[in-house]
Amino acid sequence: MVQRLALRAVIALCLPLILISHPCPVVAADEDQPQYYELRTYVTKSTEQQQRINDYWQNAAIPAYNRMGIQPVGVFTEIQDAPTNSIYVLIPCDSLEIFGAIPAKLAADTDYQQAAAGFLDAPKTNPAYVSFSSSLLVAFNGMKHLSLPPPDKKPNVFELRTYISSSDSKGLSKIKMFENGEIPVMKQVGLAPIFYSRTVIGPHMPCLVYMTSGENMEAHKKHWQGFNDAPIWKALQADPQYKDNVSHIIQIFLKRTTASQI
């Protein structure tokens, strides 16, 4: 609860600046406007907690979000099973207004409150998770909306990458690099990107976050090799304007849970 209140307070302070740089529609989704994403990370200490988090999203939260028109919601866990695996939840919103209205709508949704009661009111002696954190992301202009994999090619591997830059200008340079060639090449070689985003509020700033997908790990590695061999990528790498625009990369391989709509 404290984390959620803190996040809302930061958003309230930053909202005017965000709206100036990324104006958003008040009512309907606009294809010309980038989506916003909440990326939530739950820290767990047992497989029981992982199951409780998954059940909460599957049976309570996702139905409530869908009733608000927010979908698809992605729920993922680390690809190698372990008791301390984190759970990652990706929530797409068409505007900051929609994102900001979520807490009040959940509070007023009696079906949600009833279905989520055991999770929301978990006692100190039997908590549903260790902690969770949230990042607010905004989609790149080069891919403004979340993209679902083709129905006939459901991926079993999702790769979540965070690229951390040493300064704001270096971070913007890396985004430009994506939009000037990396995104089209990734699509062409079969990396099946789900989303690309810049972190507005969250850890490791300035940074960008994106997700690609693949049928399996072997196929995913082959797709990356195709990207690395692409002439456009090699030309971008050699361009001095993009030199040293990433200082650190965080790479996590995920799989969907039974709750996931992605």
For the regions a protein language model found, what residue spans apply to each?
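N-terminal secretory signal peptides that target proteins for export/translocation
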Residues: 1-7
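Bacterial N-terminal signal peptides
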Residues: 8-22
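Short S/T/G/P-rich N-terminal loop/turn motif that feeds into the first structured element of a domain
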Residues: 19, 24-233, 242-262
